[in-house]
């Protein structure tokens, strides 16, 4: 089965040790089996301790936390079989950051099984280098202390720091397993609203491979080889003079997927600090509205649907468009001479509310393309 959202570094990273908060320092005794004779110590440990990344095991070896036959060793040391290994398991920095921090959370829904939260732009989901405190995870642990007993504190997918919107968090291990399985099977429906530069010509599907940008390892890009399949469905809600209001549905959940795909389609998201075009031509009033978004791109996880882990029923949630994006839309409508009387969220919902058309989930193309009409 192909992993989708759960293997995405933005939603979830298989390359990082994302353990539960209960992990503590302890020792593990191992005997190198004869079938692994001839292998390097780091490679042997990676096979014997698959729950830990090879990079983490290598760092333990270099730190002297791995003893082979009562002696410190090096990652490249060859094993002959039968060696006695003692590994001191040390909590990762991420794990040490699993501490509750009270913060105001916009809880959209909560029961004994799941929490649905509306994440604001600017909030990091999970502790990592440069953001060891003040993350959504820290706030969730304060709100629901029992999450400390759930692997990964119940988080099964992520949003970029500067993307706002809906996330679901599992409160129990069975619920987490259910949600992960749904993400892997692509049955979780995620709909985003965004403002894109330019006039998006038609509704369509963007289907590519996404991987690390070979010229900038801090960015993602559409690549021909070595990437992961990524599919985004785009629906145009409204067109203005210099921008378009769009709705994006995800089949997959790659890192920065919508942002990368819209850039590749020559319609990057407004105000995107990484993939956007700060010189996109537009009127002064619109420029000010875009500037007022600050560091965040005009992207919001608007709707989330999944099968409830306990009841088995399909549940759907929506989060109103944030004020900063709403202001930009109002300015764009006014400039375009459109009805500017849509003064509140209810009126916007009546005009642009999500429908229940599931046609986006039909995989009727099997080509490497950038943008095709549906």
Swiss-Prot record:
Its EC number is 5.4.99.23. Transmembrane segments: none annotated. This is Ribosomal large subunit pseudouridine synthase D. It catalyses: uridine(1911/1915/1917) in 23S rRNA = pseudouridine(1911/1915/1917) in 23S rRNA. Its main location: cytoplasm. The active site is at residue 160. GO terms for molecular function: 23S rRNA pseudouridine(1911/1915/1917) synthase activity; pseudouridine synthase activity; RNA binding. GO terms for biological process: enzyme-directed rRNA pseudouridine synthesis. The keyword RNA-binding applies. The keyword ATP-binding does not apply. It comes from Neisseria meningitidis serogroup B (strain ATCC BAA-335 / MC58). Residues 1-20 are annotated as: Disordered. It is found in: Cytoplasm. GO terms for cellular component: cytoplasm. Belongs to the pseudouridine synthase RluA family. The gene is rluD. Keywords: Cytoplasm, Isomerase, RNA-binding, rRNA processing. PANTHER family: MITOCHONDRIAL RNA PSEUDOURIDINE SYNTHASE (PTHR21600), RIBOSOMAL LARGE SUBUNIT PSEUDOURIDINE SYNTHASE D (PTHR21600:SF44). Pfam families: PseudoU_synth_2 (PF00849), S4 (PF01479). Residues 8-17 have a biased composition (Acidic residues). Responsible for synthesis of pseudouridine from uracil at positions 1911, 1915 and 1917 in 23S ribosomal RNA. Residues 39-112 form the S4 RNA-binding domain.
């Amino acid at each position: 089965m192909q992993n989708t959202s759960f293997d995405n570094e933005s939603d979830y990273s298989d390359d990082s040790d994302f353990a539960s908060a209960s992990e503590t320092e302890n020792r593990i005794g191992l005997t190198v089996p004869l079938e692994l004779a001839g292998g390097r110590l780091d490679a042997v440990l990676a096979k014997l301790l698959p729950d830990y990344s090879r990079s983490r095991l290598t760092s333990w070896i270099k730190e002297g936390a791995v003893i082979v036959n009562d002696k410190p060793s090096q990652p490249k040391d060859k094993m002959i079989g039968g060696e006695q290994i003692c590994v001191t398991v040390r909590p990762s920095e991420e794990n040490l950051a699993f501490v509750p921090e009270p913060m105001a959370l916009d809880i959209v829904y909560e029961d004994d099984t799941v929490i649905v939260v509306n994440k604001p732009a600017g909030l990091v989901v999970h502790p990592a280098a440069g953001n060891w405190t003040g993350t959504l995870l820290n706030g969730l642990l304060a709100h629901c202390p029992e999450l400390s007993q759930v692997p990964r504190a119940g988080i099964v997918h992520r949003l970029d720091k500067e993307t706002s919107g809906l996330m679901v968090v599992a409160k129990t291990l069975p619920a987490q397993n259910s949600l992960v399985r749904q993400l892997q099977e692509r049955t979780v429906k995620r709909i985003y609203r965004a403002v894109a530069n330019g006039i998006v010509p038609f509704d369509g599907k963007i289907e590519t491979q996404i991987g690390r940008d070979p010229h900038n390892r801090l960015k993602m890009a559409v690549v021909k080889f070595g990437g992961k399949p990524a599919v985004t469905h785009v629906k145009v809600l409204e067109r203005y003079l210099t921008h378009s209001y769009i709705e994006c549905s995800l089949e997959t959940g790659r890192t920065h997927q919508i942002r990368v795909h819209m850039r590749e389609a020559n319609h990057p998201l407004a105000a995107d600090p990484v993939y956007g075009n700060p010189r996109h031509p537009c009127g002064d009033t619109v420029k000010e509205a875009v500037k007022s978004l600050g560091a965040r791109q005009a992207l919001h996880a608007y709707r989330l649907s999944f099968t409830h882990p306990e009841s088995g029923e399909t549940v759907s949630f929506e989060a109103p468009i944030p004020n900063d994006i709403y202001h930009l839309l109002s300015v764009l409508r006014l400039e375009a001479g459109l009805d500017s009387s849509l003064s509140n969220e209810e009126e916007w919902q009546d005009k642009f509310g999500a429908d229940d058309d599931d046609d986006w989930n039909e995989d009727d193309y099997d080509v490497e393309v950038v943008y095709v009409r549906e």
